[in-house]
Amino acid sequence: YDGNKNNKSNQTYAYLTRFLSQKGFYVISIQHELADDPLLAMEGNFMETRMPNWERGVANILFTIQEFKKLKPQLNWNDFILIGHSNGGDMTMLFATRYPQLINKAISMDHRRMIMPRTRNPRLYTLRGCDYDADSGVLPTEKEQEQFRMKVVKLDGITHSNMGENGTE
């Protein structure tokens, strides 16, 4: 894990932002981890050790939404989709838990730690790589997926890292 120490970390998801922009989406990309930030905790109870990072991420997302609503009031803010990969996916699920009224859909790309809220709104999706399992209780059961209209999509042959800078459309 090199986290934010990679000097190209701000380009990691350029393929995804380009793809979504070409499909007509207005894309806002947030670089959460800065070069002088401490690395994420790699041991302990992640729901405790990583929570400060996730909470800061949620605050960053909330601030960004509030500011862009002022800058771009003409956008359809009722159709807001939040997407995050890995740690960003954990932030996405925490944001969906805390501010469900602000987003229409939340999509995680192989997050592993933050429990997906069991709710019908916002609509929740998670794309799962083939190489790592999520922690126990993070993902909804098949019954919960049906009950809450959640979707877990397993991607055969796609690894956790393939969803980042090595990913393709």
Question: What function would you assign to each model-found segment?
Answer:
Residues 145-163:
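Catalytic histidine neighborhood in serine/cysteine hydrolases
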Residues 65-120:
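Primarily recognizes the serine-hydrolase "nucleophile elbow" in alpha/beta-hydrolase
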Residues 167-169:
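Catalytic active-site module of serine/aspartate enzymes centered on a nucleophile-bearing elbow/loop
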Residues 1-75:
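Serine-hydrolase catalytic machinery in alpha/beta-hydrolase-like enzymes
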Residues 133-139:
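Conserved alpha/beta-hydrolase "acid-adjacent" motif
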Residues 125-128:
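Short beta-strand/loop motif that positions the catalytic acidic residue
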Residues 31, 86, 130:
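Nucleotide-sugar donor-binding loop of glycosyltransferases
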